[in-house]
Swiss-Prot record:
Stored InterPro entries: Ribosomal_uL5 (IPR002132), Ribosomal_uL5_bac-type (IPR020930), Ribosomal_uL5_C (IPR031309), Ribosomal_uL5_CS (IPR020929), Ribosomal_uL5_dom_sf (IPR022803), Ribosomal_uL5_N (IPR031310)
Family stated for the protein in its record: Belongs to the universal ribosomal protein uL5 family.
Source species: Bradyrhizobium sp. (strain BTAi1 / ATCC BAA-1182)
Keywords tagged on the record: Ribonucleoprotein, Ribosomal protein, RNA-binding, rRNA-binding, tRNA-binding
Function noted in UniProt: This is one of the proteins that bind and probably mediate the attachment of the 5S RNA into the large ribosomal subunit, where it forms part of the central protuberance. In the 70S ribosome it contacts protein S13 of the 30S subunit (bridge B1b), connecting the 2 subunits; this bridge is implicated in subunit movement. Contacts the P site tRNA; the 5S rRNA and some of its associated proteins might help stabilize positioning of ribosome-bound tRNAs.
Lineage: Bacteria, Pseudomonadati, Pseudomonadota, Alphaproteobacteria, Hyphomicrobiales
Protein name: Large ribosomal subunit protein uL5
């Protein structure tokens, strides 16, 4: 028996609808020119980890729960006296998602996590970097359903960067709008 491979809902939607809609809108000659999602990078900067190494490990464990993949603790590269920071001290954690896990995370972000943000009015449509990548910041990581609100000792902010193969911001904005990213009007 041949097993059918699991395909995330957003990937199927991209293959069936979004790809053809973007080709029609921008007039691509080749199917490989159509922008697609490349990766999603989640980053937590933990300033308190300088004094307490356990906080970096706790944040990495929470980020691993959110992402569904092991997070890596990041260390400082240079010493900065004003921040009382020495070289090779833990200062945060990060994880890079690709393929199926990326599509699953984006699905959870759009449909579950962002609606749980207090006073959410939409994402800033100007947060593109000029090369087709979108970045957003979240003030509390406890908006994700994987994090138990009662067991979470602290709530940390996090950065989410969605990297696409789009050449311009307009193409990337059209791609993310097709994925139902709730941009502000």
């Amino acid at each position: 028996m041949a097993e059918t491979a699991y395909t995330p809902r957003l990937r199927t939607e991209y293959d069936r609808k979004i790809k053809s809609a973007l080709t029609e809108k921008f007039g691509y000659a080749n199917v490989m020119q159509v922008p697609r999602l490349d990766k999603v990078v989640l980053n937590m900067g933990i300033g308190e980890a300088v004094n307490d190494r356990k906080k970096a490990e706790t944040a990495a464990a929470d980020l691993s729960l959110i992402a569904g993949q092991k997070a890596v603790v990041t260390y400082s590269r240079v010493a900065i006296a004003t921040f009382k920071l020495r070289e090779n001290q833990p200062i945060g954690c990060k994880v890079t998602l690709r393929k199926a896990k990326m599509y699953e995370f984006i699905d959870r972000l759009i449909n579950v996590a962002l609606p749980r943000v207090r006073d959410f009015r939409g994402l800033n449509p100007k947060s593109f970097d000029g090369r087709g990548n979108y970045s957003l910041g979240i003030k509390e990581h406890i908006i994700f359903p994987e994090i138990d609100f009662d067991k979470a000792g602290e709530s940390w902010g996090m950065d989410i960067t969605v990297c696409t193969t789009a050449a311009t911001d307009d193409e990337a904005r059209a791609l993310l709008t097709a994925f139902n990213f709730p941009f502000r009007q």
